[in-house]
């Protein structure tokens, strides 16, 4: 596990952040009724996602994220998805999950500052800080939260080899 603050060049990150915060309609968001594949649909926890890449580009936003692919020096890209966890009055810890059952690399790119966080299996809590990247093995259990002090918590989840 590694945390890197101010990972991206400030100019590029400001453009990236603008897609989410200043021009939210540029990204089509899709409602996901469950937090993960092991989570019951009976629960009220849900979020919005935008699948950018899985086996092939699924979004025009992929071209804008090419610097991410280059900076991570990956052998193979598995998936890129953007997440939008809307705010609630109380912070909600989402159920733990694994992104995939095989060992691989992962990164969570925080787009905005908020009181949300990612909780790793060992108890490490990684706060959502704009331009912070968490590098970790997403085949290990981890969980997300929403936020209470912004309209939403935005991040980009990257899975790769």
Briefly describe each language-model feature range.
Residues 90-95, 102, 110-129:
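A short beta-strand-loop-beta hairpin characteristic of the jelly-roll/cupin
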Residues 107-108, 150-161:
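A short hydrophobic beta-strand segment most commonly corresponding to one strand
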Residues 87, 126-142:
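Conserved metal-binding segment of the jelly-roll/cupin
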């Amino acid at each position: 596990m590694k945390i890197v603050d101010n990972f991206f060049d400030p100019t590029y990150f400001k453009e990236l952040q603008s897609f989410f915060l200043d021009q939210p309609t540029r990204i089509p968001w899709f409602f996901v009724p469950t937090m993960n594949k092991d989570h019951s649909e009976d629960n009220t926890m849900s979020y919005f996602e935008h699948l950018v890449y899985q086996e092939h580009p699924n979004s025009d936003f992929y071209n804008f994220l090419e610097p991410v692919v280059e900076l991570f020096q990956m052998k193979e890209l598995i998936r890129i998805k953007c997440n939008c966890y809307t705010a609630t009055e109380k912070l909600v810890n989402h159920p733990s999950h694994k992104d995939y059952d095989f060992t691989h690399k992962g990164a969570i790119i925080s787009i905005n500052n908020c009181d949300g966080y990612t909780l790793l299996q060992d108890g490490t809590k990684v706060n959502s800080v704009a331009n912070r990247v968490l590098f970790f093995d997403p085949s290990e259990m981890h969980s997300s939260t929403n936020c209470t002090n912004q309209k939403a918590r935005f991040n980009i989840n990257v899975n790769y080899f």
